[in-house]
């Protein structure tokens, strides 16, 4: 019985079925198995309407007539239009007659010359030129103020000299290995030299305040390099790249946590003056050749490897010693008077650092860590790491 009712779902109801109750939605009645809504014809049949049609009475067919335009009405209008056109024709002919025949244009006396020298010609073509990176230190009106500011900040951002003695699980040799690895990272991702200098500064300042186990030293270096990249680079590598370079020794969460810890320890003071910045300042005040500049940068980076003895010197002093030694090696010139006036450093001020740097330069080829030396063998830096150090200094 239930199956039969289901099969009768779409069968129209009998003629005598009552109409649907008021208030129910008929559209949902079919879905619920209720009676279908009767059509207008069936409703009229039940109400007794249309009986004449049901009795077989035939209605007369009807036609729709469309009035044709009255031709007689249009004729006077057309005649009036033709009369007006005929009246205007003589005036139009007279107007055309005054113009006369069309004559060719006479050539211009002075033809416009479209030469390359014409100011009306503008070259709007786009030429691709190598854009030089602007030097933020090269502001003549503020050079003195910038140098004074850097000298003040280098004292505030200086790491503690003997912090490694208080580290229970790491040594200067481990730090040297870490910095050497960061040099390779910088070359791999084509980072700025300033990024490397900043990262080493962050590491030394962090280790001056926090004890670190040797298993976490690389994590500190990775997070410091990440911070320096964000501070200095236009397009810093992603965090995943820094996780990758550690051979997945640490995960992304660990790197970000260490980055957060370094920021807290450094009190978010990331704009630390570096040797690289002071060298840039010196190059602006004392013009020199590209080889001297590259050798100065090479000597400055060599001091990043060894915490002892270079942590006891300010970056401005190390930069002065590097400039003097590079200039002496290439050109035979010593500390110039122009830089003496700008920095206030005499040769006696930089002499202790200069002696230490000279010893480092002499032993660079025998040093265990060779990444910096390999870096400066390239033509980009004029292969200055292959230049032999002078045996003695004329001080």
Swiss-Prot record:
Keywords: Cell cycle, Cell division, Cyclin, Cytoplasm, Mitosis, Nucleus
SUPFAM superfamilies: Cyclin-like (SSF47954)
One cellular-component annotation, GO: nucleoplasm
Positions with biased composition (Low complexity): 27-60
Highest taxon listed in the record's lineage: Eukaryota
Region of interest (Disordered), ranges: 1-93
Molecular-function annotations in GO: cyclin-dependent protein serine/threonine kinase regulator activity
Keyword Cell cycle in annotation: yes
InterPro entries reported in the protein's UniProt record: Cyclin, Cyclin-A_N, Cyclin-like_dom, Cyclin-like_sf, Cyclin_A/B-like, Cyclin_C-dom, Cyclin_N, Cyclins_cyclin-box
Pfam family, one: Cyclin_N
Subcellular location: Nucleus; Cytoplasm
UniProt record, GO biological process: cell cycle G1/S phase transition; cell division; G1/S transition of mitotic cell cycle; G2/M transition of mitotic cell cycle
Cytoplasm listed as a keyword: yes
Subunit and partners: Interacts with the CDK1 and CDK2 protein kinases to form serine/threonine kinase holoenzyme complexes.
Record function comment: Cyclin which controls both the G1/S and the G2/M transition phases of the cell cycle. Functions through the formation of specific serine/threonine kinase holoenzyme complexes with the cyclin-dependent protein kinases CDK1 and CDK2. The cyclin subunit confers the substrate specificity of these complexes and differentially interacts with and activates CDK1 and CDK2 throughout the cell cycle.
Family under the similarity heading: Belongs to the cyclin family. Cyclin AB subfamily.
Protein name: Cyclin-A2
Organism encoding this protein: Gallus gallus
């Amino acid at each position: 019985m239930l199956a039969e009712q289901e099969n009768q779902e779409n069968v129209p109801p009998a003629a005598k079925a009552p109409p649907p109750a008021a208030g129910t939605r008929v559209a949902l009645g079919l879905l619920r198995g209720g009676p279908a809504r009767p059509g207008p014809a069936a409703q009229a049949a039940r109400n007794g309407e249309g009986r004449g049609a049901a009795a077989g009475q035939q209605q007369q067919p009807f036609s729709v007539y469309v009035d044709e335009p009255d031709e007689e009405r249009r004729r006077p209008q057309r005649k009036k239009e033709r009369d007006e056109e005929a009246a205007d024709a003589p005036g139009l002919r007279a107007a055309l007659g005054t113009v006369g025949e069309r004559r060719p244009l006479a050539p211009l006396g002075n033809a416009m010359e479209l030469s390359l020298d014409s100011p009306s010609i503008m070259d709007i073509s786009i030429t691709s030129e190598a854009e030089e990176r602007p030097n933020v230190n090269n502001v003549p009106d503020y050079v003195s103020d910038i140098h004074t500011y850097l000298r003040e900040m280098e004292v505030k951002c200086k790491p503690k000299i003997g912090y490694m003695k208080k580290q229970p699980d790491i040594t200067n040799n481990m730090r040297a290995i870490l910095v050497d690895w960061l040099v390779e990272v910088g070359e791999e991702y084509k980072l700025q030299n300033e990024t490397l200098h900043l990262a080493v500064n962050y590491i030394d300042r962090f280790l001056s305040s926090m004890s670190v186990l040797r298993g976490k030293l690389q994590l500190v270096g990775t997070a410091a390099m990440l911070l320096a990249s964000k501070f200095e680079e236009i397009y810093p590598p992603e965090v995943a790249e820094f996780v990758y370079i550690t051979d997945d020794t640490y995960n992304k969460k660990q790197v970000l946590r260490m980055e957060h810890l370094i920021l807290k320890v450094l009190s978010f003071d990331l704009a630390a003056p570096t040797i690289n910045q002071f060298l840039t300042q010196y190059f602006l005040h004392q013009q020199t050749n590209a080889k001297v500049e590259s050798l100065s940068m090479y000597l400055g980076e060599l001091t990043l490897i060894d915490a002892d003895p270079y942590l006891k010197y300010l970056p401005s002093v190390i930069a002065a010693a590097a400039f003097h030694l590079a200039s002496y090696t290439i050109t035979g010139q010593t500390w110039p008077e122009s830089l003496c006036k700008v920095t206030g450093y005499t040769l006696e001020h930089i002499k202790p650092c200069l002696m230490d740097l000279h010893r480092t330069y002499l032993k660079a080829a025998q040093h265990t860590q060779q990444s910096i030396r390999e870096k400066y063998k390239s033509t980009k830096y004029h292969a200055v790491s292959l230049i032999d150090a002078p045996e003695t200094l004329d001080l």
